[in-house]
């Protein structure tokens, strides 16, 4: 890594990758930004287009299309490459196809001498983050998945809309698989400093069945969006930007990334969406919430499904 210069390499210039790339340039997050894609002409075109936006950015960024060799001096490699989720297809349906793709990508990156942090977004993200960790040989702290950062953002937005509160003042987490078995941590949800359960108890207009419907809409959001426009990319692009800023700026921010469990939440040897403190070293620590019995059971089920799905492809 070059001292004093933040280099981020993006592998995959599809809709998700380009949404992330645009947000990176828009906010001037890194000094160097490299785009890599199997379709070299596409990566080159995107780099050209993005570079023309740099004069409008808050700080200058050198943008170019490159290769895995550019990962050698990278602080962060973000992977969005892979086959997208089709209408009616679950994230876990993608596991076999994208695992093969990922193993090749990670090997190519590591051959460059890369020694930074991986941030994974390709689905099924928890499984592919685990695959990246295994293939790379890097410490677990330096391999991170986008996890349930987007799910938690959707959750906060919808709760804020329901309660007529700025979603930035809604503190609520979605944990577990980024997918069908994820779960809301109702027991720790707060609006400002007030517990959501207290607000419910003191206001007749707010009902638990409405909250349950909100969670269903959060869990199924990708399906609804894919049915209408074919893919999701703006939300995940901003989620990746948020994690990137936490890493490069050494923020020690708590984000629900896919992190490796070693006994936390009663689970081991799995990458799962949980609150974690993120800084320049990657995952500084996992924040272990005290779940109620129902939440514990649902979390254990989510991890079990991930492990069962992952086993045949490792």
Swiss-Prot record:
Q: Which gene produces this protein?
A: ldh2
Could you say which residues bind substrate here?
Answer: 85, 91, 123-126, 151-154, 232
Summarize where NAD(+) binds, as residue positions: 16, 37, 42, 68, 82-83, 121-123, 146
Per UniProt, the enzyme's principal EC class comes to oxidoreductase
Q: Identify the GO cellular component terms for this protein.
A: cytoplasm
What controls its activity?
A: Allosterically activated by fructose 1,6-bisphosphate (FBP).
The name of this protein is L-lactate dehydrogenase 2
Note the NCBIfam families from the entry.
L-LDH-NAD, PRK00066.1, PRK06223.1
Q: Where are the transmembrane segments?
A: none
| Biological role stated in the UniProt entry | Catalyzes the conversion of lactate to pyruvate.
Instruction: Alphabetically list the UniProt keywords.
Output: Allosteric enzyme, Cytoplasm, NAD, Oxidoreductase, Phosphoprotein
* Assembly and interaction partners: Homotetramer.
The metabolic or biological pathway listed in the UniProt record of this protein is:
Fermentation; pyruvate fermentation to lactate; (S)-lactate from pyruvate: step 1/1
- Record: active site: 178
Signal peptide segment = none
| Swiss-Prot/TrEMBL GO biological process terms | glycolytic process; lactate metabolic process
Q: Which organism is it from?
A: Bacillus anthracis
Where does the record place it? Cytoplasm
CDD domains per the record?
HicDH_like (cd05291)
Tell me the superkingdom of the source: Bacteria
Where on this chain does beta-D-fructose 1,6-bisphosphate bind?
156, 171
């Amino acid at each position: 890594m070059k001292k004093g210069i933040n280099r981020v390499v993006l592998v995959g210039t599809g809709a998700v990758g380009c949404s992330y790339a645009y947000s990176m340039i828009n906010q001037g997050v890194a000094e160097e930004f490299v785009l890599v894609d199997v379709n070299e002409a596409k990566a080159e075109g995107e780099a050209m287009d993005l570079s023309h936006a740099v004069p409008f950015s808050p700080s200058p960024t050198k943008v170019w299309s490159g290769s895995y060799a550019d990962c050698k001096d990278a602080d962060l490699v973000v992977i969005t490459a892979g086959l997208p989720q089709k209408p009616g297809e679950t994230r876990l349906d993608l596991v076999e196809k994208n695992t093969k793709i990922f193993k090749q990508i990670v090997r190519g990156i590591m051959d460059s001498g890369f020694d930074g942090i991986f941030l994974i977004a390709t689905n099924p993200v928890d499984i592919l983050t685990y695959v990246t960790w295994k293939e790379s040989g890097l410490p677990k702290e330096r391999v991170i998945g986008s996890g349930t950062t987007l799910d938690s953002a959707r959750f906060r937005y919808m709760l804020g809309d329901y309660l007529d509160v700025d979603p930035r003042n809604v503190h609520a987490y979605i944990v577990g698989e980024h997918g069908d078995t994820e779960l809301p941590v109702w027991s720790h949800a707060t609006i400002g400093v007030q517990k959501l359960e207290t607000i419910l108890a003191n206001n007749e207009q707010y009902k638990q069945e409405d909250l349950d419907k909100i969670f269903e809409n959060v869990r199924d959001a990708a399906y609804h969006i894919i049915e209408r426009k074919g893919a999701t990319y703006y939300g995940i692009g901003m989620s990746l930007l948020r994690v990137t800023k936490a890493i490069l700026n050494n923020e020690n921010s708590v984000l629900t990334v896919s992190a490796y469990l070693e006994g936390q939440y009663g689970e081991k040897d799995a990458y799962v969406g949980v609150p974690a403190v993120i800084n320049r070293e990657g995952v500084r620590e996992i924040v272990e919430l005290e779940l109620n019995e129902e939440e514990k059971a649902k979390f254990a089920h989510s991890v079990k499904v991930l492990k069962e799905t992952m086993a045949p492809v490792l």
